[in-house]
Amino acid sequence: LVGSEMCIRDRNTVGTYIHTYDDRTYEEKKHSILATDIYSAIRGKKYSFIGEGIYEKKFTNSKLSAGIRHQQSLTENKYAGTSSAETRMQEAHTSTYIEYSSKIKRFNYSVGVQGSRSWFNQEGEGYQKYSVLPRIRLTYNFSDQAFIRYQGQISRSTPALSDLSNVEQLIDSLQIRRGNPTLKMSTVYNNTLNVDFRKGLFSSSLYLLYQYQHKPNMEETFREGELFVRTTANQRSWQKLNPEVEIKVGPIKDILSLSISTGINYFDSRGHNYHHTYTNWYYCASATAAYKKWSAYFEIRNHRNDFYGETLSYGENYHLLSVSYRYKQLNVGVMSLNPFGSNYRIGSENFSPLAPSKNWMYIKESSRVFALTLSWNFSFGRKYESAERRLHNEDNNAGTLKSGK
């Protein structure tokens, strides 16, 4: 190792306070007579802290990096209404890693290991887990125009606080949602392969993802008396296979650029009392044109869906068109969302054989929407080169058990 440069690359601390105020009313009527009346009120407070730091030391042809991250939170929730309960949950996650990267001619490699501790407590129940997790990245550059890269990593997935609550919430006259404080962490095996090729105006890439989760925290539905209980448990396994191809051309005559990507999502979800497979084909295409002071952009994509447990979540299906004109530092344009469509919808479908359901949200206002855009670019004073932001920590999980479907 010849020559070195040492620095603390990034530091980031975030403190969060989340106040939950959630009321829900549900009624069922039969021949105008009230048959079911459910009211739930949730009041909650969550305090959390996240701190992270990254250290790097660069050598002539290699780099050594290390980091540490700590997250801790306290959550207090009160449930009132048709059913009442109080919860007080504490959790902490600490992880540290070390990674070494280098290159040998056309071959680049990176190996690392992460050590972590996860802890959760709710009225004496919970878990404490220590883990040692490896990761690797291998890249081979065939030339300046083509390369192949493999990345592999083992990680842990912690249960959501909302699923760990020792609480029950009525959904309707036949269903109840129940938390599970005995949930344990699951193991995630992640593998990705990238192949890129570029020549002239043409570029293409092949992406392949395979992910396997062992004992994932997935939903479970069973019958208890006259009610169907929806809860979360450590199930058997979950797998995802995702090949994707992207092709780009341009800019043609420094005016037109075209891009299209398409892929398949295949899911295999295995629970203790269910097994589902699902395949989804998706695409996204876009075109960008720029001539003198005019520019235009068009994008279209279909549903890219996700399947987890027994629930199919539908992605967005939309198209977008925009045209703009630039005069000095002023940019004026018009944009339209779904100008050639009649309706916009997103939703989900549950395939439980005991209590299947469908949920759709229709937003007609999101079709044939037109908007004017206006921007003014200005700068003054000294200019500084901005550094890449590598750390982005946030906590947006309130830790409350939802009562809706």
Model segments located where?
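Outer membrane beta-barrel strand-and-loop segments of large Gram-negative receptors
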Residues: 38-50, 89, 178-180, 184, ...
